């Protein structure tokens, strides 16, 4: 039987983040007892999402101690994705995590941030159809969720539930992912 200790994840939010993706990730990870920090990459804890939903982050990205964090996650959205890419703490943390074997995940347009950092070179990945051409160096797959080593990508809001369940599986185990899937009545 798999044994999982309390995992920690940071989900980066920025001005213009796709709120459905971002909040779904936070909600399902927290249901799985993953300790999630919502970290603002916009210099303020108060964020306005891509569809004008007001969100309060737990901390600024620059204030988070990443030393015991197991995974960082980048939701998509425009202009959220370029705003994440413009934040040095976000990009430096993604590079550090990817190179040290820690988990990095991105959905929708956000895998383009990982590609711009060279983190998808020689890896399988996916992104929103409008951003697949930005995945330089990657073998692009047009599927909901792609896991290649320590990097997980998804193609967008339509794949957000399977993406979130995959992150739950990675951080809390298959049994917990199955429990969450049943609890939310996701039958796909």
Where would I find each of the regions flagged by the language model?
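A cross-family phosphate/adenosyl-ligand binding-site feature
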Residues: 48-58
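Short N-terminal binding/cap micro-motifs at the start of the first secondary-structure element
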Residues: 17-22, 46
